[in-house]
């Protein structure tokens, strides 16, 4: 990575991340994300590259802009139900498959300087943010038993202005997005039964394009409010 600064701070980041397992447990039962990886999409052995710029504006607001320097891949190889964390996975253990996303992202996050007063209709102690980003050259895939379902040629535009994130007086974690706009387009919805194929548009054995179920376009304008309350590690409530 490289760091420079004059008007704010510029960070060029190159990363290859591998996490064996992340697990969440409640009442002695857990769900584990195994084989979590971040790398270049073209070659898993290569690095994902990003350019970040951080600046404090005149009003005291914090501005972060971010941009990919290559197409990156974030992958969870297996999602399993487990009793004990950290054990070597057995192929017969219950699994719901794995997911991955390839993306080239560019966007910005603005954190407003609002002091320590309560915010919004839920009287949250936290922050107000504007988030905007665009994903291009995207692929979103689900994989299980050598079969793969793929959203190919994905573009996603997201704008969430006036987003509130913090804690309510009742101790609930609150994420409020009163102005969430999103537009998703997918060039082809593909399926592969060849276990050698992974995140590709053409079959690696035959070279033929993978079967497509057509394209997809979605436009959303949402007002959402999410509150999460902790119910304890034991008992019926959980989270």
Q: Where are the regions that the model predicts?
A:
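Intrinsically disordered, low-complexity polar regions and short flexible loop motifs
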Residues: 12-239
């Amino acid at each position: 990575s490289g760091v420079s600064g004059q008007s704010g701070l510029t960070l060029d980041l190159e990363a290859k991340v591998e996490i064996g397992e992340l697990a969440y447990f409640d009442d002695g039962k857990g769900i584990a994300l195994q084989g979590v990886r971040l790398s270049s999409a073209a070659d898993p052995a290569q690095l994902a590259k990003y350019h970040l710029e951080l600046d404090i504006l005149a009003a005291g607001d914090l501005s972060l802009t971010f941009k990919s320097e290559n197409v990156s891949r974030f992958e969870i190889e297996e999602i399993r139900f487990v009793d004990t964390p950290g054990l070597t996975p057995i192929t017969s253990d219950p699994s719901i498959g794995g997911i991955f996303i390839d993306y080239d992202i560019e966007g910005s996050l603005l954190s407003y300087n609002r002091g320590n007063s309560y915010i919004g209709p839920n009287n949250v102690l936290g922050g107000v943010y504007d988030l905007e980003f665009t994903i291009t050259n995207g692929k979103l895939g689900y994989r299980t038993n050598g079969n793969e379902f793929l959203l190919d040629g994905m573009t996603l535009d997201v704008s969430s202005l006036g987003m509130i994130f913090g804690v309510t007086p009742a101790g609930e974690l609150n994420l409020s997005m009163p102005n969430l706009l999103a537009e998703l387009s997918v060039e082809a919805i593909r399926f592969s039964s060849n276990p050698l194929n992974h995140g590709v548009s053409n079959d690696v054995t035959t070279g033929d394009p993978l079967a497509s179920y057509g394209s997809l376009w979605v436009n959303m304008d949402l007002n959402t409010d999410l509150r999460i309350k902790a119910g304890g590690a034991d008992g019926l409530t959980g989270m």
